[in-house]
């Protein structure tokens, strides 16, 4: 995924989508990935079939099926029902994941406030996401993580930075961490699962401003 010579374009994932109108706005704003939480406790959880209907209504959209503590067979079933091009796994050990899984996988590693990682890192060839640790929720808490920890890892591998990102802090986050991608959910909402369209647009615009400086 890393390339030399070309200006970096930070990928954007808008997660916790539950409505077609929100997904459409995210895509029109320039989001690269649309995230749907299809397995796991979350106020933003959506049935795989409902997520699949949204994806089907947006031809060409790249959907990510977000899941917590699933088996490979479960993950594949949820992904197929969603029409997802990628799966994002929380609370799954990458060491036990089959190498021949047919879809790209993002493994999420929670980070404590003191910078300690709460799960093993996946191998470098697999995409890593860092999110703020929470003892109950797997994501979408609105809490940020220590960006210095993320920056140290981003210097050695591609990673997705999550955890409390919003239109007001994402430029600083990109400047400090220099991630391959950013992920936002609760920071773009007016209520859990209901996106604030103006905040979505502002978020993507802020990422592009950060990229212009980074170039």
Annotate each PLM feature.
Residues 1-215:
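Conserved N-terminal beta1-alpha1 strand-loop-helix module at the mouth
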């Amino acid at each position: 995924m890393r390339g030399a010579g070309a200006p970096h374009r930070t990928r954007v994932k808008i997660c916790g989508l539950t409505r077609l109108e929100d997904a459409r706005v995210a895509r029109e704003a320039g989001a690269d990935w649309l995230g749907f939480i299809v397995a796991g406790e979350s106020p933003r959880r959506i049935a795989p079939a409902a997520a699949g209907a949204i994806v089907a209504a947006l031809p060409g959209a790249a959907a990510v099926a977000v899941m917590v503590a699933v088996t490979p067979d479960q993950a594949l079933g949820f992904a197929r029902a969603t029409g997802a091009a990628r799966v994002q796994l929380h609370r799954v050990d990458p060491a036990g994941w089959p190498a021949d899984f047919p879809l790209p996988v993002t493994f999420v590693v929670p980070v404590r406030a003191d910078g300690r990682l709460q799960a093993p890192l996946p191998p470098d060839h697999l995409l890593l996401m860092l999110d703020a640790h929470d003892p109950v929720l797997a994501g979408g808490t609105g809490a940020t993580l220590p960006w210095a920890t993320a920056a140290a890892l981003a210097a050695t591998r591609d990673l997705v930075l999550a955890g409390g990102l919003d239109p007001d802090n994402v430029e600083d986050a990109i400047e400090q961490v220099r991630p391959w991608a950013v992920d936002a959910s609760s920071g773009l909402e007016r209520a859990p699962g209901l996106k604030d369209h103006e905040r979505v647009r502002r978020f993507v615009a802020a990422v592009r401003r950060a990229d212009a400086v980074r170039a």
